Amino acid sequence: MNKPLPDVALTEISPALVSLDWVGMQGVEVPIRLAEASIRHPVHAHVDLQVDLADPSVKGIHMSRLYRLLDGYAERQIVSPDTLAALLEAMVESHLDCHSSHARLTLSFNLLCRRPALITEGLSGWKSYPVKLDATWHAGRLCLDSSVDITYSSTCPCSAALSRQLLEEAFAARFGRQSFVDPMQVATWLRENASFATPHSQRSVATVQVRVAEQAAELGLMTLIDLVEQALGTPVQTAVKRADEQAFARLNGQNLMYVEDAARKVQQALEGRYAASSVSVRHFESLHPHDAAAQTSNYLS
């Protein structure tokens, strides 16, 4: 005969009668499938999920209920705004005995997709984008934000100008006294000396967050990523040959940017497309031992 197991969450009262904003679990690992037309493979996600504990007399929530709901969701559902809303609502309903009224969850994962080389046909490689989905259920409504980290190259405009000045001075020193300059001679000199000075550039990261519409059929992650990469103009590459590396060098020269420029370009690209957006960029300076950073947001406080 099975003996009944004690459940102190039901039989005991907390000595401190205080309601709690959020209670739940962090870092639960599950495989998930995304509502993204171009992403067919499952991804490995870490999930945080909580409900409020409004009744101060209730000692604790039922974490196993949350876990089972998440496990079933990952097994049977594709992550989209409507399925996330259903999961969050079920989390609240599973804790009516705790007088819970709202729930939230965060999914963190790396989104892998193939990116083609700039020039070489048939050449591509995998690129990883760290993604976070923050979903909240309150008063019967879903609030969903997605954020993604996008890596790009930034070349300093000031350093480029200083490098051009040095090249100009070197060119004048070599050819300034000649009344006629042979174009072939100039071409040879440039081939050997155009790198007399080079501007500093560095790998950089833009963290972009946007509000996802409740009625959206998909998460729109690849749409967001493509939009930001097009705005910046210099996304880091995967597989390259020399022709692709040369094309990347040209893109860097055509898209010189301070950290301020990068933040403004991205936010401008987002305007009018999302109800709310924020941009945070970091340039991992090769000139300095510290980073340059800029932020902008139109989220309401």
Swiss-Prot record:
The keyword Hydrolase applies. GO terms for molecular function: GTP cyclohydrolase I activity. Signal peptide: none annotated. Pfam families: GCHY-1. It catalyses: GTP + H2O = 7,8-dihydroneopterin 3'-triphosphate + formate + H(+). Keywords: Hydrolase. Belongs to the GTP cyclohydrolase IV family. Converts GTP to 7,8-dihydroneopterin triphosphate. This is GTP cyclohydrolase FolE2. It comes from Pseudomonas syringae pv. syringae (strain B728a). The gene is folE2.
